[in-house]
Structure formats: C-alpha cells, structure tokens
Amino acid sequence: MNIGILGTGSIARTMAAEFAKVPAFRCEAVCSRQQATGEALAQQFGIPKVYTDYDAMLADPDIELVYIATPNSLHYAQTKAALLAGKNVLCEKPFVPTVAEADELIALAKEKHLFLFEAITTAHHPNYALAKQYLDDIGSLRIVSCTFCQYSSRYDALLSGQVPPVFDPACCGGALMDLNLYNVHFVVGLFGEPMLVSYHPNLYRNGIDTSGILLLEYPDFICQCTGAKDCAAPGSVQLIGDAGRILIEPGSSNCQKLRLVRPGQEDICSKYSESPWFYEVAEIAMILALKDYDACYAALKKTQQVVTVLEAAREDAQLGF
C-alpha cells in the first residue's frame, strides 16, 4: 500500500523508518509546508514525491493511505479531507479533541468503506495482550498506577517566552493530550470507560497543563494516571490486585518488559526488544492486507472511548479546549 506522509517532524521520521521495514508499505510521497524539509525527509528515506500542497497530494491516484503527523489541532480537518478524497488514514495520536469530531470521522470512514486508524503504540504491543491475559492471576484488582513523565525538549522554550505547539492550548497541546493519553489508552483498552473522571493539572500561565494527575474510577478499583512534560521520572504501569501485581516498564507507550509478581511463586517475565512502533505498523499492515474492517472498527471503538475520557478530563479541569 502506497503511503503519503503529511508532516516532517520527529514522529514522521520515526514512522517512515518503520514503514520501510514492512514489505506491504511503500512511502510514495511526503507533504510539507516547506519544500526543503519535505525534500530532506524524502532523501533520507528514498521517497519519490514531495508536495507542498496537501490537496495536491490527496489528488495523487498513487496514494492509498495518508499518514497524518501534524499538530493535534489539525488532525480533524486533515483526516476528514483525506477520507473525502477516498484515502485510508492513519492519524497520529491524539486522534481528535472532541467526541463529536471522532464520531463524524468514524461514520465517514464507514460510509466510504475506508480504513481509519489512530497511530498509538499501546494496544499493539505483545506484552499488552499478555497483561490482559494475566489479570485473573492477580486476584481482585484494587489499584492501577500509570506514570509517564518526560521532560520535554520544548519546555525550556516555553519558559523563555515561546509557545511551541505542544504547549499551546490553541493546538490542543499539553501533558494530558501528549503523554497521559498513553496511560488512558492502556487503562481504557483493558477496562472500558470509567464511571468518574477527574483531572488535576499543573498549569502554566498560558493555561496549558504541563503535568497532571488523572483519576479514573471504576466500580471495584481506581486508576491514577500521571503525565508530565515539565519533569522526568522512570515510567511504569502497575496493576495491583489482592493476590499479586503486574509491572510493565518503561510504561504505557512501550510495554517492553512485563513481570507478573505473586507471593510465594516465581515471577513470570516477558521482554521484547523491537521498537513499540514496529508492532503498531505490523498489525496495521496485517489488518489492511486481510481487509479486516471488524478489527479496524474495534480499535476505533477504543479510540472513541479514549477521546470521551480526555474530553471529560479537560472539562473537569476547565482547560478551555
């Protein structure tokens, strides 16, 4: 399947490298506002076509799937345009800010019989499936704790007076939408939507959340999801029951190492060495090859639930976007 890449940032480069590992994918074109950045990406990965106009790339009959790697606030309009042009879409996380936008795009994809995916690593990792399998082994679940704290390479720019898109409310930036989203995907993917959502952010003077703690309440257990772009700490997920616990490191975006711990029993460990994007791209390629719309729609259902939680969290904290 021929891919057109929209955007030239670091995640676009990462995904271009992953696409190259999968024979089913071929990067056919890249679209950038600036010719020079588009040409640089194209040269690095052997991409034959460079566009500076998105509509022109969408009009290219060779493009079958558009990968959208642009600021969060652009995802809705760019995804809709691609679907209307008859293209399958892989949209970088976070999918879109609102439930209404998510519902509209998913309905449009189904109407046009197109594939639509949110690019999110969490659900595709083998250890994520293993964590679900081991839930019964830890007894009654009581606490889930997820931590993703990564000092942003753009945070110093924010402190100096600049407003990078990742810290701009107008671009739907912030720690919740960029990092804590992975924690939400991990939890909601396993347990569905919570009963109650509350978000407790640290706010910068422009109103953006640079870090925060999200609480998700379920009938029999509670989840604490910590996400930060203004400080750093080791990442992890812990699912703690009354008969044991599951530890995942380095966290919800990369379930590389899993350990099942139970008193009086030998630990069960699982470790994978591939990048988390490898599993994401490989599974999407398989879904496309099999024309497995049911798998696509099941993933979109989880995306809808995550968007619902994130929108509720922003409303609870009165973030204003």
Functional labels for PLM-detected ranges:
Residues 1-45, 319:
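N-terminal Rossmann-like dinucleotide-binding module
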Residues 3, 45-106:
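Beta-loop-alpha module in the N-terminal Rossmann-like domain of NAD(P)-dependent dehydrogenases
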Residues 51, 91, 116-118, 248:
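Hydrophobic residues in well-ordered beta-strands that form the structural core
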Residues 65-67, 103, 283-321:
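C-terminal helix-rich "cap/oligomerization" subdomain common to oxidoreductases
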Residues 104-122, 140-143:
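Rossmann-fold dehydrogenase core element
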Residues 123-195, 320:
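Predominantly a Rossmann-like dinucleotide-binding segment in NAD(P)-dependent oxidoreductases
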Residues 183-253, 282-291:
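Contiguous beta-strand/loop segments that form the cofactor/metal-binding neighborhood of enzyme cores
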Residues 271-282, 298:
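Active-site loop of classical SDR/Rossmann-like NAD(P)-dependent oxidoreductases
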